[in-house]
């Protein structure tokens, strides 16, 4: 497990965690990020357990929404971040496989000029099923060809970027395929991508990735991303940034729990729960 120096001066950076049924694992992730001086937003994607309650108790602000997939939860978190003035988001999973102590590594790469920083996992093949090893190799090759530059780990959920970047891309994915689309579309738009080696914390959680359906979604994401680029799609104008959020140095005393309601013409409408 790689070590990283404690982060200072993280004003304007919000950690965003899309989460689904992560009650047994999410609290250490939230506390680890807070220890790095990073405020935390958890987007609870329709969990059937106590993910929202556990995350709020650990110090996170929580958005609760109907289940729509990881990609939808990420976009919801980015929209919330922009609306509340956050300049950068650190995206990571809530299952404990990403080490919060490595957050400074991604942040440093972003400050070094990269538009999108991806944490490249040091995967241990002996811990993976054969189909997963083959898929990882094939996916890296296909995304590299589609993006026009080498992308070693297009499936990693540990990322750092301006939230408006994701909102400016013509994304269609709602699940894990969104992360693949982001890599391809960002690279083809001429944005600067960087990959930073990170460790992986293995646990006994059953993967939420469906071997057949999510593999098909991956191939569709690659084809559709290339097609959208050939169709002349370009980055949309970046959304206006709200008044910059103040620096947060500690967890809020009473974390807010917010519901997200679907609305016509918008993917989600934020409303404070009663």
Where are the predicted features?
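Hydrophobic helical membrane-anchoring modules
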Residues: 1-9, 123, 146-148, 171-274
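Short, well-formed alpha-helical segments that are part of the catalytic scaffolds
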Residues: 20-35
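Acceptor/aglycone-binding surface of glycosyltransferases and processive sugar-polymer synthases
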Residues: 66-83, 100-176, 203-223
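Acidic helix N-cap motif at the loop->helix transition within catalytic regions
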Residues: 24-28, 49-58, 101
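Short loop->beta transition adjacent to catalytic acidic/histidine clusters or analogous donor-positioning motifs
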Residues: 12-13, 33-42, 50, 60
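Short beta-strand-to-loop acidic/aromatic patch adjacent to the donor-nucleotide binding site
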Residues: 86-97
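A conserved acidic beta->alpha catalytic loop
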Residues: 44-52, 96
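Short hydrophobic beta-strand elements that form part
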Residues: 14-18
């Amino acid at each position: 497990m790689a070590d990283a120096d404690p982060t200072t001066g993280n004003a304007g950076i919000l950690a965003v965690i899309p989460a689904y049924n992560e009650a047994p694992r999410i609290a250490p992730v939230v506390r680890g990020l807070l220890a790095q001086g990073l405020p935390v937003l958890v987007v609870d994607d329709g969990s059937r357990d106590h993910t929202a309650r556990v995350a709020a108790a650990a110090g996170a602000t929580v958005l609760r929404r109907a289940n729509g997939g990881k990609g939808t939860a990420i976009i919801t978190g980015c929209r919330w971040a922009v609306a509340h003035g956050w300049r950068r988001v650190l995206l990571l999973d809530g299952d404990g496989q990403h080490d919060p102590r490595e957050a400074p590594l991604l942040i440093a790469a972003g400050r070094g000029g990269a538009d999108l920083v991806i944490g490249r996992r040091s995967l241990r093949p002996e811990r993976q099923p054969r189909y997963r090893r083959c898929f990882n190799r094939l996916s890296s090759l296909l995304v590299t060809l589609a993006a026009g530059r080498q992308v070693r780990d297009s499936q990693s959920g540990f990322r750092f970027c301006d939230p408006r970047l994701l909102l400016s891309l013509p994304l269609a994915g709602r699940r894990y395929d969104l992360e693949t689309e982001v890599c391809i579309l960002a690279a083809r738009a001429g944005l600067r991508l960087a990959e930073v080696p990170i460790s992986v914390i293995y646990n006994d959680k059953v993967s939420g990735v469906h071997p057949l359906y999510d593999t098909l979604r991956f191939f569709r994401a690659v084809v559709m991303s290339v097609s959208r680029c050939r169709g002349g799609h370009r980055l949309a104008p970046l959304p206006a940034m709200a008044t910059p959020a103040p620096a947060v140095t500690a967890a809020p005393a009473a974390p807010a729990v917010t519901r997200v309601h679907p609305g016509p013409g918008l993917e989600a409408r934020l409303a404070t729960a009663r």
